[in-house]
């Protein structure tokens, strides 16, 4: 059968049933309501699997809308490859990928084993003093002011400073790092994205060469001197590993803690509960992670198959929005509420062979933020007459969050 064009002018492959076609860009769809997570949850009223021919950046893709289907695909690395998850190699014209993120089993395991010692619970525990010091340093700048613009004053800086310390990078470079990272992840201009990716690559290559001559007891030296099955990593393997840390360290946690503080500022009862019962903060962190999945990763179908009664063809892309799994009412009671006692599984940090290596670090960072803010400030809120702002291109993020509080 031949492909057809739908009324919006998009080409629909012949194997896609017309009733599964959804003519929207999911990021624009998310902006139709005051809360993008509630907005995209409207997709739960339709099929469990839809096809979007005109989604972000012109990449037609399947979109699973339910937790179970998303979880099943995450767990099936054989039929759903992660090799073109982000596709930096295509933009740069290089033969290496972000690893282990874009490496399929079994090869990915060697790369995970290089990084795992630096992110396991015992290693994160050793970092706690540094993480809390960074948080307190930033809070001290506005603690007596009665309020702040949370994104610029804290959320963008806190996880970034932690990341810079982990990799031994200078804070003075942070404005440039932000510019490259934001352009690469969020710009609709492909030329600008390519230029940003090249800027990141060139800087990191120079830095890694300098660090070869300056070994330290840290993560970068650990990567530079690592071996897999008795052989050292080559240049591309090292670059792929450091670049995946760059993107994860500068954006994902920073974007996430904006949503968490926004939620807290709108939920006075949750503030009181956590302040009076700080032992519940880890549970709150888990359910905030569940409720606010900010990333939609990508998989590529490796063979013709049928799922949810629909044919998928080898080479089809699948968008994996954590925010659709997060708010699935089939999986969670009252999914839009954050409940520290929920104790429910989620896929915000992915699952299966590509579950997030930095999960323990991210959870500890988030917990420290909640601990330090709740210990200092009462009745954290968005001031009357002010509004928060957010965006849904790339990693979903709060871009402005004015806060005031009582002492």
Residue ranges and their predicted role:
Residues 1-407:
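Cytochrome P450
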């Amino acid at each position: 059968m031949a492909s057809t064009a739908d009324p919006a002018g998009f080409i629909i492959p012949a194997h896609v049933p017309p009733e599964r076609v959804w003519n929207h860009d999911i990021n624009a769809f998310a902006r139709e309501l005051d809360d993008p997570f509630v907005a995209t949850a409207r997709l739960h009223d339709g099929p469990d699997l839809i096809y979007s021919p005109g989604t972000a950046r012109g990449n037609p893709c399947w979109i699973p809308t339910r937790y179970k289907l998303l979880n099943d695909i995450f767990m099936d690395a054989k039929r759903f490859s992660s090799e073109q998850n982000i596709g930096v190699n295509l933009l740069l014209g290089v033969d290496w990928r972000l690893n282990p993120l874009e490496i399929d089993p079994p090869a990915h395991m060697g790369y995970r084993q290089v990084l795992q010692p630096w992110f396991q619970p015992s290693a994160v525990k050793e970092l706690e003093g540094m993480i809390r010091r960074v948080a307190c340093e930033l809070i001290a700048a506005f603690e007596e002011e009665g309020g702040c613009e949370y994104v610029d004053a804290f959320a963008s800086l806190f996880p970034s400073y932690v990341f810079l310390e982990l990799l031994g990078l200078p804070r003075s470079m942070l404005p440039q790092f932000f510019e490259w990272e934001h352009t690469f992840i969020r710009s609709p201009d492909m030329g600008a994205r390519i230029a940003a990716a090249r800027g990141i690559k060139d800087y990191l290559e120079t830095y890694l060469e300098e660090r070869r001559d300056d070994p330290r007891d840290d993560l970068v030296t650990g990567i530079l001197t690592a071996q897999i099955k008795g052989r050292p990593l080559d240049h591309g393997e090292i670059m792929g590993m450091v670049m995946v840390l760059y993107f994860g360290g500068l954006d994902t946690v920073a974007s996430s803690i904006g949503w968490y503080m926004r939620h807290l500022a709108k939920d006075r009862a949750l503030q009181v509960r956590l302040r009076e019962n700080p032992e519940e903060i880890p549970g709150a962190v888990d359910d905030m992670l569940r409720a606010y999945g900010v990333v939609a990763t990508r998989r590529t179908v490796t063979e013709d198959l049928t799922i949810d009664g629909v044919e998928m063809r080898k080479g089809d892309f699948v968008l994996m929005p954590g925010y659709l799994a997060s708010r699935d009412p089939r999986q969670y009671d009252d999914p839009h509420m954050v409940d520290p006692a929920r104790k429910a599984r989620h896929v915000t940090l992915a699952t299966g062979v590509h579950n997030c290596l930095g999960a323990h670090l991210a959870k500890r960072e988030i917990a420290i933020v909640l601990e330090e803010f709740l210990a200092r400030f009462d009745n954290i809120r968005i001031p009357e007459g002010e509004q928060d702002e957010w965006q849904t291109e790339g990693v979903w993020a709060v871009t402005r969050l004015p806060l005031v509080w009582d002492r």
